[in-house]
Amino acid sequence: MLKKQDLIGIIVKQMSKVICDMQSNVDVEEAVVKKEYFSQVASLPVRENYSLELVKTIYTKTQYPSNRGGFEKDFMMYVDADCEVERFVKINERRHNFVNFQYINENGLIRHYFPDFMVKTADEVYIVETKACRDLNNYDVNAKKKGALNYVNRINKLKADDRMNSVWHYCIVDDRTFYEKQELSASVKDILIYCELTNNNTSDEFFNY
């Protein structure tokens, strides 16, 4: 017999799934698109010792994590130097609170996920999460991925001028793949396409509610 606490947990998980499924199945053709822009946030606080002056982002300086932030720093520098990249932004979840997706965490609760970057090329937008290779099979990483992919699929059903006349993508760039491809002088777009193909599977084994 299930304990009361276990039963409540099951109900919460099922309700969370129903709510997320309902939102994912909204008819996009009838959607009212509210556009918000990164430029609405005029500036971001940064720590001087852990920030970069970059060309292709709207902010004078962009911060990277002080603790184990080397991968993000290297990724930003590589993106900034790539001729196919028109612009990109490092998402700050406190200031860019309009860039988030819902997902169901391991406890069955609905949470908001803020990805790391948005990268714009001529006719594509990439929502990018940078992640250590060892974390790719983490439950929450895969739950966030599922939520982001649902969002991207809905975005791509909108009229072209409501999605920046671009096809939208979501991909997780892991550190091992990034450094391997960087060593081969791969373009940022090639890296993103490769990671989208290899890291975007969402196995149902993670989501047995």
Q: Where are the model-predicted features located?
A:
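Electrostatic, structured charged patches in enzyme active sites and in nucleic-acid/phosphate-binding
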Residues: 1-209
